[in-house]
Amino acid sequence: MKYYKLTLYAWLLWTCIACQKKDQTFPVPTLKSIPFDPVFNHNSEYILVLGDVQEYTGNAVYAPYFASTINWIYSQYLHGIKIKYILQTGDITWGNRPRQYKVYQQYTDLIAKYIPMIACVGNHDYTYDEKGEIVDRYSSLFTEYITPCAQNWPIASYFEPRRLENIVVSGQLQQMPYDILCLEFGPRSEVIAWANRYVASHRDRTFILLTHEFLTRNGERINKGSYAELQLRNTSYSTPEQLWQKLIKNNDNILCVLCGHNGFMQHLFSKNSTGREVAQMLFNLQYQANGGDGWIQLWEIPADRDSIHVQTYNTIRRTFSSDPVGTFKFKYR
């Protein structure tokens, strides 16, 4: 609790500083083709992961790193790379600010019409009260500002009509039915019940679960002291461990879990009720230099192998992370 209070104080202090920067001029992003990056294999399909981007959208000094990453993705798409999804792990803003959503919109709209760019809602995408608590889930402007980016998402199911916090986006990986299940920060019990019904009634489909808070910076599944527990008020919520027990563990067609929120990169493998190891992955940009420094996570899905190869890559320096927690594989068929 002491750590939480110190972290909350630091966040509120940063918020005050950020408010003083409201007159920042963000560079206008443009797209131009750059050379093919040989990190890609034309015979594979890819999922690209953006972590939490609130530093990119909140500071004009960092925005060029975001723009460079977007342009790199666009260029590889032009070079014929099969990018199936771009996944964003929440915290688009610091405190639900319209200006930051607009920056995110401006930068991601450039490629959203070519590649589904799917985001989940983070704890910083809600409005806080003076105690640093979230007293109204519906305070988030997430749906309002993400809807334009979602025009080409083939949404198969909504928990609530036309709200994007809890949805299923249908798709394919290597000609197999693979869907993205997006869940809100600290999912309510009724949201988990909806997800259970949908996943259980679609056993012919496989799901990648995208939600904001799940692992610690050390790669442990969060049980007690989650930010959902500490911040959400006037609503039910679930801790990551409860989400595992109530939804993920007993549905073998949930392939993996992707989150952000903490640290930089981590992963955990846990056996579900069938004995299959479920990959749980964390990728978060906010604590990196320059708001993210051009880092991205690459998931390579080869046609001729049964495992997804995950690597952490810097799109500006064109180098892989040397940290072994950022490189691993898990089976997808």
Task: Give, region by region, the residue ranges found by the protein language model.
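Active-site environment of divalent metal-dependent phosphoester hydrolases
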Residues: 56-57, 94-96, 121-130, 164-167, ...
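C-terminal motif of bacterial Sec signal peptides marking the signal peptidase cleavage site
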Residues: 15-18
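Active-site-proximal segments of metal-dependent phosphoesterases and phosphodiesterases across multiple
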Residues: 193, 200-254
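Conserved beta-sheet core of the metallophosphoesterase superfamily
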Residues: 119, 234-303
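Acidic/histidine-rich helix-loop elements
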Residues: 48-70, 94-96, 130-155, 218-236
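A short C-terminal boundary segment appended to hydrolase-like catalytic domains
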Residues: 290, 297-333
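Extended active-site neighborhood of metal-dependent phosphoesterases/phosphodiesterases
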Residues: 98-194, 201-202, 267-283, 295-300, ...
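N-terminal active-site segment of His-dependent metallophosphoesterases
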Residues: 21-100
